[in-house]
Amino acid sequence: MKQRTGWTVVLCAAVAVLLAAAQQSDVIIKIEKGERAVIALPDLRGSGEAQQYMDAFNQTLWNDIDSAGIFRLVPKSLYWLQVPRQPQDFRPQPASPPNATSNVRPNAQGLWLSDWAGPPVSADYLAFGYTGVDSRQIVLRGWLYNARQSGASNAQVFGKTYLAPLGEDGARKIAHEFAADILQQFGAVSLSGTKIYFVGERARGMKEIWSIDPDGSREKQLTFYKSLSITPAASPDGTRLAFCSFAHGSPGIFVQSLETGRRLSFYNESSPLTATPEFTPDGKQILFASSVTGWAQIYIANLDGSGMRRVTYSRSIDMEPKVNPKTGSEIAFISDRSGMPQIYRMNMEGADVQRLTSGEGEAVNPAWDPAGQHIAFSWTKGYAPGHYNVFVMDVATRQFVQLTHDAGRNEHPSWAPDGRHIVFSSNRSGSLQIWTMLADGTQLKQLTTQGRNTQPVLGK
């Protein structure tokens, strides 16, 4: 029993917390593999009341394009003094470009498209436009131009008008939409419209569920139980949040509406432990771990907790069920049936159990990618207990790659809908915070700074 209790502490963050608490266009521009298109994103200006919201607009646009990981953004310090607001601002291309000492373009550099393609900017693409106000709406007219085209008349990739309620939220909304349309031209998916749900600790001994946008904006507290609320999971349609809470004493599953903020009905069988909820891809059922019969086992139930059915039948601790989002027919989970926590998979009936990780250290926190072909997970891989790093495994070949290296504790990976980004928690900056990175381990970005934050999951 002593051995199992010690293992439980390191099985997963969920159990550790419990023990501690007890204590437009169809044309896609193709970029060759390994290359990144260079894009210039000069600050757009607004007229009238729109101008006061342009800082939020420009920062949001920059963050969305930068975080996509498919562009190299030109530093704004290299941009020309004059930025076109609309296509009509471009000057006719001269027959031959002037040399560096020419006065052909006095005080007008930037109004020739070739200015943006040549040094020091050297951009492949230029995004520009302007905003104004109409009937209490902020209006953006935005364009994307191919700066390598000879002449502005042939350079337009797309131009579009965007509308949103006047205000900072509206400015962010049209920036997200403009960025999404830019990314769409290159076959990339914008993360705008998604949310990161996580466990935030702002007061000692109290953990609540919070949300934040993928660009680090609009951080918001969602639960107020003044207790421990952990292991969040978002429903596929973005209407429900499931999590484990100590609010009523014993840890149980709570389900909360993301539309109203109200708690929804969910029946919990009497059990010392009920945790790690996960919605099925169709959003009709919830999987979770419960110790109602002794050791924690995996169960599945309806959204209100009815129809509870046991899935695993081991004399071990089985937790953290994650359903393949593509097939909906297999579950990845963690178990100590081989001695230390490892990742396994099985079908929805609990049969055809296969071990995926090697046993060289503790492997926890499995997370399927949207295509259902890879699993991100946390692994000590020979290090001392607790020193986790994030890995990604190809499920078919069992080959894996390490994404984080020698930078503290890195755990709880979760995939973004685009399959290109991973959100995770790390204490590399001192305390546990929420970070994002590309799925190759590059372009790391810290999203949270206050308190301690962990167990992130992506949802709508």
Residue ranges and their predicted role:
Residues 213-217, 257-261, 302-306, 347-351, ...:
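Short loop/turn segments that connect beta-strands within beta-propeller blades
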Residues 22-37, 135, 148-223:
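C-terminal/domain-edge helix-coil "capping" segments
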Residues 190-192, 236-237, 281-282, 325-327, ...:
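Residue-level detector of Asp-centered blade-edge/turn motifs that repeat once per structural unit
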Residues 89-181:
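Amphipathic beta-strand/beta-sheet edge segments enriched in Tyr/Trp
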Residues 190, 200-208, 224-227, 244-253, ...:
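A flexible loop/linker signature enriched in serine peptidases of the S9 family
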Residues 196, 241, 283-287, 331, ...:
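Hydrophobic beta-strand positions that form the internal "hydrophobic ladder"
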Residues 28-112, 130:
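Short beta-strand->alpha-helix linker/helix-N-cap micro-motif
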